[in-house]
């Protein structure tokens, strides 16, 4: 049965969040508790890296190509002596992350990342929707460090969340690429087609054609400031033969969606069968509800395995004809 997964989130981002693929690194369940540690130390020891053993470091490792929600949970100290010195590093985890030992702004690296944070009486919670805009393999870390908590000659443990981002290709169009913005990307983009926003002219239309040649499909559209998506919920609804239809009329598989109307960003993901090629469709970016000069994103399908299939069929037919000719 096909279905579309999304969650209408009521928050400042006014976005759709898919409800599938939720990864949780929860260090609040006692794994860092100073009372559970087995290594006794002297109070006056310096808490250096070499003092740690495997029992002192708890790992949570995640691999992703995007369109997943990550949750990072760290216990609060408050009146609990077992977490008195606990710290999150970087303090604003997901807003800032450690990459190759340096703190970086995640939004400078992943276009379309959405971050939320909240606290309870006992927990600090950070959430991030990781978009599929991963232009190269990389990894980042946040840690929940209870190693500064000392009680009865025991020290707490350190919890490390390590996220491995796998390079992705987004079949779609980014009409709002900023080549002047300081980034780590060095001119790279996960989008198959991208246009510098400095050269996008509101008095000219641009036709962006993207051909999907893989059965694992990530679609994306980014509209410039002052433009809106048409259909409004692009990839939930698409333009097909000049009509707005639901994507499930063309894609007979589960579809994951993330739509940020305020930022004019939309993503979708699904998996095709081998050699399956749905009919083409499109979405537009239109300025001030005027479709005179739209920025058009056309999505066509030429599933990679279909080439292999056709090649082998043609090859077998030729062999068969040659054999017949010799008989």
UniProtKB/Swiss-Prot annotation:
Residues 21-168, 169-304 form the 6-Cys domain. It comes from the Eukaryota. Keywords: Cell membrane, Disulfide bond, Glycoprotein, Malaria, Membrane, Repeat, Signal. Glycans are attached at residues 246, 264, 298. Its main location: other. It is found in: Cell surface; Cell membrane. Disulfide bonds join 25-60, 74-144, 93-142, 173-208, 223-285, 234-283. GO terms for cellular component: cell surface; plasma membrane. SMART domains: s48_45 (SM00970). This is Surface protein P12p.
């Amino acid at each position: 049965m096909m279905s579309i997964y999304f969650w209408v989130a009521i928050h400042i981002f006014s976005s759709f969040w898919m409800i599938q693929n939720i990864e949780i690194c929860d260090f609040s369940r006692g794994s860092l508790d100073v009372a559970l540690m087995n290594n006794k130390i002297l109070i006056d020891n310096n808490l250096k890296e070499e003092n740690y053993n495997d029992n002192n470091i708890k790992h949570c490792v995640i691999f992703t190509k995007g369109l997943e929600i990550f949750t990072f949970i760290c216990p609060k100290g408050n009146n609990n002596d077992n977490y008195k010195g606990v710290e999150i590093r970087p303090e604003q985890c997901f807003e800032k992350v450690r990459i190759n030992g340096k703190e970086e702004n995640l939004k400078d690296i992943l276009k379309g990342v959405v971050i939320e944070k909240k606290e309870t009486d006992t927990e600090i919670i950070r959430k991030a929707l990781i978009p599929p805009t991963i232009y190269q393999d990389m990894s980042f870390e946040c840690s929940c460090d209870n190693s500064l908590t000392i009680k009865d000659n025991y020290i707490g443990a350190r919890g490390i969340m390590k996220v491995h981002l796998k390079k992705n290709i987004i079949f779609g169009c980014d009409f709002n690429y900023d080549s002047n913005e300081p980034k780590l990307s060095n001119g790279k983009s996960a989008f198959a087609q991208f246009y510098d926003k400095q050269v996008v002219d509101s008095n000219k239309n641009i036709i962006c054609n993207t051909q999907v040649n893989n059965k694992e499909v990530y679609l994306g559209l980014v509209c410039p400031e002052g433009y809106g998506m048409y259909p409004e919920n692009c990839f939930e609804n698409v333009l097909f033969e000049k009509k707005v239809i639901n994507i499930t009329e063309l894609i007979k598989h589960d579809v994951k969606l993330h739509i940020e109307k305020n930022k004019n960003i939309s993503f979708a993901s699904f998996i095709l069968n081998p050699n399956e090629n749905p009919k083409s469709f499109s979405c537009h970016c239109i300025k001030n509800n005027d479709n005179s000069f739209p920025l058009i994103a056309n999505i066509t399908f030429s599933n990679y395995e279909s080439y292999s299939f056709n090649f082998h069929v043609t090859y077998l037919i030729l062999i068969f004809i040659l054999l017949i000719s010799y008989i």
